[in-house]
Amino acid sequence: MKIRYGIAETIGLRREMEDTHSIRDEEGSGLFCAEVYDGHSGSLAAAIACDVLTTYFLRRLREGGSGGGNGFMAEALREAYLATDRQIADRGTESGAAAATLYLNERGFLAANVGDVRIVLKEGGRAVALTMDHKPDLPEETARIEALGGSVISLDVPRVEGLLAMSRALGDTPLKPFVTPEPRIVEGVLGRKNDLAIIASDGLWDVLTSEEAVTLAYRAGEPKEAARVLQATATGRGSTDNITVIVLDLKAYAAASEHYRLRVTRILDRAAPTRPS
C-alpha cells in the first residue's frame, strides 16, 4: 500500500533525542504502519518500543491468519503493547515512553496510544483526534490511580506520584501499577474527507492545537513540506522539547472509501472504567 508521507524531527534544546519513529509498508500483510514514540528519563524505552512493538503485532497477525474474527486485530495490538512493556521492564531500565501507532489496510484503520503522542485526522475543515491524551487529571485516570493506592499531585502540572505528567506509558516500572501500558485502541474506516493525518510527539502539541496543525499541514501541500512547516512552527512558538512529526497524505487512500466521514467501529480500552449498561 503506497502512501506518501513526510517526517520532520528536532532535538530542540534537550540534551538527548528521546523520540523515535518508524514507517513500514508491509506488502505481505497489506499494512501501512506509522509510529511515534516519545521517551522520557532516557531513550531506551522508546528505542525498544520502536524495535519490537509492531514486529510483535505483525507476528500475531500472521499466527492468527484470516480466521481471527471480529476484534482480533485490536486484541493483537493490545498484546503487542503489553509485551513491549514487559520487554522494557526486563531490560532493567526506569525510562518510559508515550506511544502512538497507526495501521492502515484496504479494509480500514487501527490506531492506538498511551500517553500524549497524538494522531489527528483532517476531516473537511476540522481536526479529528484518533487518540486520547492520557493526563493524570482526567477524572477517569485519577480515579483509576487512586483506586490502586496512588496519587495525582499538582506541581507545575498534575503528575502521578508527583513525578510523571502522563497516566499511561510503556516502561516507567517504578510507577507501576499507577502508570499503565494499557492502550486505547480505535478501529474503523476512514471516509473520503479524511485526506491527511498527523502523528506527532507532544513537543508539537504543547504549542499547536490539532486544528492549527491540520490547517498548516493542508496549506503546505506536500507531506514532506507539511512536516517541516509543523516542526518549524512549533520551534518558532517556543517549544524546547524533542519534536517528531509524521504527515501522511491520505488523498488516494481515502478516495476509495465508500464512506463520506470517519466511521469508528470499535474502541478497546481495558483501563477505562466500566460504565453500567
Predicted segments, located by residue:
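PP2C/PPM-type serine/threonine phosphatase catalytic domain
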Residues: 1-277
